[in-house]
Amino acid sequence: MLRRAIASLLCVLGLALAAGAAETPIGTFDRVTIAPTKTSIYIGTVALTMPTFVRKNGAYESSYAAKVFPYFFSNEKGALTITLTDESLRKLERGEPVEFSGRAVNTDGEERRIEGKATPEEGAHGLRGKIKVRVFVSKRIELIFNTSYRFGEL
């Protein structure tokens, strides 16, 4: 009887370890690329480009460039930080959407609040999907960008 109990316990333990090993290592989520995106504004557009984000201490960091057409004098560049916990990354890996927040600071020191939602593609284990980003330029101006993301070395 004791042998069966020990064998059952070892079997359950082995399955638990196998399930944990099936998870993608967090290191896979160290870099994320966001596709260039564009949104409409009154009589114009805003194009947003960002190089690959790198994860440091639970936050993704990158720079950004926003080009405003035809109002070129409103173009801006700056730094961008997005906070995403390990648990949120595990949710993405399981195929669950996650919300995130962050901030951007342009070269003039003006801060922009950022909120968004990442929705993974089915069967991609969170490594790619769609992303919706809201940039709060002022109390009354909010820019919404819809694009895609991809984790890993590219």
Describe the residue ranges of each PLM region.
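Bacterial N-terminal signal peptides that target proteins for export
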Residues: 1-9
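N-terminal prepro-regions of secreted/extracellular proteins
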Residues: 5, 20-23
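Bacterial N-terminal signal peptides
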Residues: 8-16
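Central antiparallel beta-sheet cores of small beta-barrel/beta-sandwich binding domains
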Residues: 22-154
